[in-house]
Every structure is written in C-alpha cells, then in structure tokens.
Amino acid sequence: MNAMRRIDYAARKDAINAQKRAAYAARKNFSVYSSLNMEPKPVTMQSISNIKSFNCETLDGAKQQQLQSAHKRLLMTAAKQPPGVEVGKAFDLNMKPLTQDVVGSAEGHSVKLPNFNVPYAVIHTHPACGVFSPGDLLSFVDNESLKLMIAIGHNGHIFAVEKSSEYNSNEANGIVWQLSAEIDRLKNIPRAELPDEQLLEQTEKLVWQAIRELQKNGVKFYE
C-alpha cells in the first residue's frame, strides 16, 4: 500500500513469406503509431485502483489475480517515467517473470520486449490510454509463442488480445499485413491533404477493424 501511494501452408508459403517480409519492413513505420492518441495522461492512485482482473483462456483464476497485481506494479513503475514513455514486462504462463521491467527510451517512447520460444504473455503501458497500435498487433501475430498481450492505459483501463485454441495464424498474419498496407497508403498521402490528426484517427479506425477481423479467426479481445 505504501508503494502504491508513492505511486494448406505449402500452397500459401510464398504469400505468407511475402507477408512476413512486408511486416518486417513495416516495423519502423509502425513505431510511429505506438500511441494512437498522442497526448499522454498522468498515472494517479485512482488509475491503479481502476485496474481489474479479467477472465481469459490462457490463465486460470489464481494467475489472473497475479496478472492484475502485475498490472498495478507496472503502472506504478510507469508513473516514475517521463511523459509518454512506455513500460513493459514479459511472463511465462505460470506468471513467472521472463524480464525485469523494461522502459522505453525517452526519444522513442515505445517499449521493445524480447521474444521467447516458450509460451508467454506480455504487458505494457499505454500512456495515452489508447487501443493497441498497429505495431502491437504485428508483434502479437508475428510471435507464435506470444499467447496473451495486454495494454494498460495510464487511466487503468485494459485492452487485451489472446490466441485461443481456434487461432488461425495464417489468416491473422494476413489481416495485419493488410492493415500495414493500408496504413502505408495513408502515410503516402501528403500531409496537406491528410493532416497528422486525421491520419491517426483513420489509423485507429483501421486498427479496430483489424481487431474485429482477428476475432473471427480465433483471437479473443478484452476491454
């Protein structure tokens, strides 16, 4: 409490490989949209109190409670960072940490977490409290072992995506590849015709559309 107070794969192989190459090339572009709403919010005691547990397929009830506690601790770490800087952490599915708290750079803001070969979950903060970025979705579908991803807003609101037993990797990769291509198209429109604010608004709409499509292909979405 004191701490809180301180605050047919072969047939599609070429297409899949092309999608992966395109997704890899898009990583740098995606980082620009790590926060779709660019105004960071402060972390408050109310924010931390707002964090709730949620039922998911990947973790049992006890581990869901551990996850809730991890979210609160991470948000307290985020409160100590410069405005807009993300913080993240990775866990195995027994909720044993695979990393320490990882802090994004003051310049780039976005946090970069390593990939693992064991099934795992990642949690990270979203200072502006927005939904997943295109880069988040890319990381989620690109890493087979990543089963659960959570974004914690500085207001305590949580977004989560989970690979269920019905997850279709090929379709999911295709959905995110299409998202990447559409965002690239928008980025190529001169800013005089599509100002940054409108670009971010359209990007967010595309992300929500992609999430709806992912839900049809075995991705569970929680908020």
What are these regions (language model features)?
Residues M1-S34:
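BZIP DNA-binding basic region
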Residues M4, Q19, Q66-S69, R73, ...:
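Exposed alpha-helical structural elements
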Residues I7, S133-S139, S165-A172:
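General structural signal for secondary-structure boundaries
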Residues D8, A23, R73, T77, ...:
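Residues that form generic nucleotide/phosphate-binding pockets
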Residues V32-V118, I189-K220:
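Glycine-rich short-loop/terminal segments
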Residues K96-L146, G153-H154:
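Short HxH-centered metal-ligating active-site micro-motif
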Residues S145-E223:
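Divalent-metal-activated hydrolytic enzyme cores
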